[in-house]
Amino acid sequence: MAAYLDAVGKTPLPIHIGMLAGGGTVRTAAYGFEPGPLPPEALREVHRLLEESLFSGALGISLGLGYAPECFYTTQELIAALAPLLDSGVPITVHMRQEGAGVVEALKEMLTVARALRTPVHISHLKSIGKAYWGRYMPEMLALLTRAREDGLDVSCDLYPYTAGSTQLIHVLPPEAQEGGLDTLTQKLRVPEFRAAMRERMQTGTDFENLSLLVGWENIDVSTVTREENRRFVGRSVAEISDAEGVDPFDLTFDLLASESCAVTMIDRITANEDICAALRAPFSSVISDATYPTSGLLHPRVYGNCVHLLEEYVRRQGVLTLEQAVERLTSRPASVLGLAGKGRLAVGMDADLCLFDPARIHETASYAAPERCAEGMDYVFVGGVPVIAEGQFTGAVNGSVLRR
């Protein structure tokens, strides 16, 4: 972590950059993609790497319990792995173990972790995946978080203001598919017995985030690939491609992942506007983009439009938030979660990281079909008091810095 942050700090940056220490990265470094409890020596290495990352300036710890290898932790094993955070005040951000049928139990698990470690826990992109659960679980989750806060726990959440998400296509598979790592998975996807086992799990399984069952292949679009022969699939749903190619959607997915060495991303339509609105209204919520930056194919429009989309859609059009509430969820709330004392507010002595815009003109131009379009109406952006955007144009200024805890 120290070497990486030092290298980034030597790079001209137009914006500030901070890092969380990846819980999966740390476990992989200590024990690979192997399942089961960590042996004592691997657990000690996890502790050492966490402590080293925090000492080097990591803003917190990021967990992805729906992904391998972190999915292999039991709750108590996870608490043991995170022991260096006890009473530390260091935030743990978490993609929970489930966001579909088991999302409420997954949230209760993280409240157990918060109580055990007595350190802040922040739920990443809070949502309920699957039509059967839209409007059903979000009120219960927000009530659980509210009660936990009333009981003295430092817990919070964030969300992205879109009904579609984006991640790696391998995550339509059950987590145990990744035992041994992605190279091993690529080989296993060519084995008939493994494919049959995966198909059976995906047709019936409710103990993982089973996207093909929760939202259907028609709501899972291929967004990036690396091989030229597969580019015809980009921007189309697995169901559409399956029909056009005359191939079963499971076989199509297995074949595509194997041919691409698992380097395929997807855009998946997974959640409901009513749940977004409910989470936005929670005073302990922040708004994030959850954006990734693939070098080819289709981006998610949130890469270019996330913050403007919030202001245009949920302030001006739907009236879910006031302008002041929306700005708070983009600024002082996330700054507070990450312990960035100099960020997020307009006050004497605070860092001059500012945006100047006309609320009436703010407009997202990016779409799912054409995502690489800059938003309109964000006239000026100042980083450390230096204009990086002026009259809507990039100035070339590079006044960003590395943020360390």
Range-by-range predicted roles:
Residues 1-14, 29:
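Catalytic alpha/beta active-site cores
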Residues 191, 278-284, 289-290, 355-401:
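C-terminal cap of metal-dependent C-N hydrolases
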Residues 52, 58-110:
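Divalent metal-binding pocket/active-site signature
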Residues 65, 96, 125-127, 159-161, ...:
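Active-site proximal loops enriched in glycine and acidic residues that flank catalytic Cys/His/Asp
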Residues 264-276, 322-327, 335-371:
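Acidic, glycine-enriched loop/beta-strand segments at the rims
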Residues 17, 23, 57, 95, ...:
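Divalent metal-coordination and catalytic microenvironments
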